[in-house]
Design a protein with these regions (language model features):
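A mid-sequence, solvent-exposed acidic-amphipathic segment
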Residues: 182-194
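Bacterial N-terminal signal peptides that target proteins for export
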Residues: 1-9
Length: 194
């Protein structure tokens, strides 16, 4: 997939976030599934090759959209090699050897795009207008929106992680740096929290 197509996908994700600004106040697994679902329902806006890929492998795309959060204590990963690094996201995309893995990688990149908007615009704005401390306020604003979504998307995130994602997990295991825990242990902990 060319850089232009990746840029188009990220541009569409940013467009959807701008079109749905009320959704950008929280980036929990349920919210990432909500945003990923919005992309899947807007495939007519995507280049046809990407749209066809996401329609063929929606669960791989959605799993990618939450997989970047599977690492616990990412600050203990090697510099520039933590799960939310764009270099890591692009490494995952480049290493994707088949269509399901490419859909997964695009979901992973969509997750990073959504977090970039949240962490660089929406959360700081909310911290400013509410006089919250960054340590408490950040988590508060990241989790607040999911309460407005109801249980549908958090339940969908939970059901999603129970599916077989062995190939995607194997890809992550080869790229992600361990934190305090191995990537396998991080994933087990994450699945227990969703």
């Amino acid at each position: 997939m060319t850089g232009i197509r990746i840029a188009a996908m990220l541009g569409i994700a940013a467009f959807l976030l701008a079109a749905l600004p009320h959704a950008a106040f929280a980036w929990t697994p349920g919210t990432h599934v909500f945003l990923g679902d919005a992309v899947l329902h807007s495939t007519q806006l995507l280049p046809s090759a990407i749209a066809d890929l996401l329609r063929a492998f929606p669960y791989d795309f959605l799993y990618g959209s939450i997989a970047a959060d599977t690492s616990i204590a990412k600050k203990y990963a090697a510099v520039g090699r933590h799960c939310h690094s764009w270099d890591v996201g692009f490494d995952i995309h480049e290493a994707a050897t088949d269509e399901p893995l490419r859909a997964f990688a695009l979901g992973y990149l969509a997750h990073l795009a959504a977090d970039s908007v949240a962490h660089n615009y929406f959360v700081p704005m909310q911290l400013t207008v509410t006089s919250s401390t960054s340590s408490i306020g950040h988590s508060y604003w990241e989790s607040r929106f999911e309460t407005h979504l109801g249980e549908r998307y958090s339940r969908q995130a939970h059901d999603l992680i129970l599916l077989d994602h062995a190939m995607s997990d194997l890809l992550l295991d080869g790229i992600l740096s361990p934190t305090l825990f191995s990537t396998h242990t991080n994933r087990r902990l994450f699945r227990g929290m969703v």
